[in-house]
Structure formats: structure tokens, C-alpha cells
Amino acid sequence: MGQAAKNEIEIGVVLQGGGALGAYEFGAIIALLELMDAIDVPGRKVSLVAVTGVSIGAINAACVVGAKDRTDARRRLRALWTELTLETPSYWWAGASRDLALLGVPGFYTPRRDVWNVFNWTNYYDTEPMLGTLKKHVDFDSLNASKTAFVVTAVDVASGELARFRNHPHKKEAKTEIGPRHVLASGSLPPGFPATPINGINFWDGGIVDNTPLGDAIEAFSGSGDVDRILVVMNLFRKSRALPKNMIEVNDRLDELRYGNRLRQDREHAHTINELVQTIEELAAVIPAGSLEPELEARMVDAGRFKVLDAITDVDLADPDLMAEAGLPLSSEESGAFRDFSADAIKRRHDIGYKLAHLKLNKLFEAHGLLPAH
């Protein structure tokens, strides 16, 4: 049997970068928002407390938080991905459809044309089109005023420091008035894309340093024991795969390991933190009330919110076992998948993401007593 449902539910979402693989996240987010509608019943408060993202995950996150409500978020995501989809003739073979993005994605990026200056290039594409796309599909007034914490990351090219652009103040960090450039900066992956300048500082894609901004989402949760805290992490990358057979596959596998392994390391770190929190709670239970300085006592109580790490739920969008359970054919992304914005690929990924997330999250919500068990 699952646990008894609590009356207050906090949900956080972490979105990875991965180029066109972000269509998996698109489908998964739609499923999550629909299930949130299903559990949001009278007498229960369901809150989306945080959405953090990197690169294409930052763009998806902006559509969710930069919306008036869950219905509006779904509409904005669908409109965004319609614009990012490349329509190709039906008689084209898959490889040609995939590689068409090398010539640009009109709502995202276009090739540089100053070929006479090629020896001074530091990037291959112009990302100005994405600024217009973000302005069209994200309500930045709603995003900046939202109660949902929004955090995206980017790397200061010169200093190497990881910058966080957030719509809420946090500790000593002031809030940022989020605009299209902050979101674009999080997705400015070299050498394809140029650095994005903000206030005289040039930024590259935050995924270079950390492709899964887990901690920023965790810190948005409350420390109350009366709240059911659920953190959903969208994982785009396979842990295991057959040996690469050519240089393109080598590069793709390198990206999978580079961008996917950090999440697994964070989970191991999370287990250690949980043990420390458990120790703090046990100490707090035997220390006489009022014997600690108020500030220290408050910090010990606040430590409880980090136990949310026990409730991290990976929606592994590349898990063959989960795909089999969902009744989906086992498939493997071919080389160059990160740039495949063709209509067939986007629809397939959306549909897979939706089905896998719906299956995984439906079970999760049943276990938390939020939905009736089947």
C-alpha cells in the first residue's frame, strides 16, 4: 500500500540540456502538468515550487514558468516546439532529414554568412532567431512575478565561474530580472553557438559545467514535515550503449557520458547528505529544548528539507526497461540525434517522453496516495 496523501504537495522539476533531445522533455512535461491537474483537488494544495534547467532544458523551463497557468504552459510548449520543428518532404531519407539542421533551424539558429572572415570565427551559427522565439513563446512578466522558482545556469567564458540566473533572491544572491538573453545564455553551446553577452559579460552553455542543476531545485522546497515534496528529474542520456563504430558515434557517446554522468554522481552525493541530515535530526531530538542559540536551532530544523533527496524521481527518457513496460518498441537514437529537429524525430520523442513520464509519475503519485491505485 502507498502512503496516506498529505494536503500540501510541492513539486520541483529539473531539466537537462541535450539539443533536439529536449523534445523528450517536452512530452514528459506535458504528462506531468496533466497529472498535476488530476491531483489538484479541493482541500489539497499542489504547488510547482521550482523549475531549473540548462540549455534546451532552460528554454523548456521558461515556457513552463513564463505562463499564466498549467494550461497556458502546455499551449506555450506546443507552440515553441512547432516552431523548432523542421518539416521535410516525405520522400527524404532519415539521414537527410536529420542533417538538414546543419543548415539552420529558422526559429533557433542560422549559419553565419561572413565566410570571408572565417579564420576569425569563434562560432558557426547566429542564435539571434532564438531571442525572437523566446519573446514570442515566454511571458517574461509572468516568469519574473511567478511564485515558482526559476533557475537557469550559464558559464562566464572569461572567469570560468558558473552563473545562476534566478527569478527569486536566494541567500546572498539577488534576483535577476529574467529576459530572453538569460535563457539563451544557458543554451549558448560552443563552438556551434556564440557566447551571449549580458551586461558586458560573455556566457556559454551552463551544461559545460553542470548539466543537471539539482541543488537549485532542492533549495526551493520548504522544510515543513507536513508537506509532501517530490522532485522530478528528466534524464535524457543513456548510461550504457554499444561501442562506437565511427567518429560521429564517438563524439555522441562522449556527450552522453559528459552530460549524463553528473546526475548519477549527484545521486550518490545525495545519499551522503541524507545520512548527515538524519544524524542532525537524531541529535536535535535528544538536545533539551531552548538549550541552543535560536539561529542554530533554526538551522537544524531547516536541515530537514534536504531529505527531499530521498524523493528524487528520475524520469529516465532513455531507459529500455521503462520503454518496454510502456509498451514502446526499444529504440536507440542514431548518431547526430542532438541536432535532429525533423518533424518525425520531434513527434517520436514527444510521444515517448509523454508515455514514459505518464507511466513513471502515475505510479509515483499512486505511491504517495495522490491517485487511486490500479
Pin down the residues of each PLM region.
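Patatin-like phospholipase
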Residues: 6-12, 20-122, 128, 134, ...
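Acidic, Ser/Thr-rich peripheral helices and adjacent loops at domain boundaries
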Residues: 245-287
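A short, conserved beta-to-alpha structural element at the edge of catalytic cores
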Residues: 226-246
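Active-site gating loop/helix substructures
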Residues: 113, 117, 131-136, 141-226, ...
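Small-residue-rich anion-binding loops in enzyme active sites
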Residues: 1-14, 154-160
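Glycine-rich beta-alpha junction loops
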Residues: 152-159, 210, 235-240, 305, ...
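Extended hydrophobic secondary-structure segments that form protein cores and membrane-embedded regions
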Residues: 12-15, 47-55, 151-154, 231-236, ...
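C-terminal helical/tail subdomains of lipid-metabolizing enzymes
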Residues: 275-374
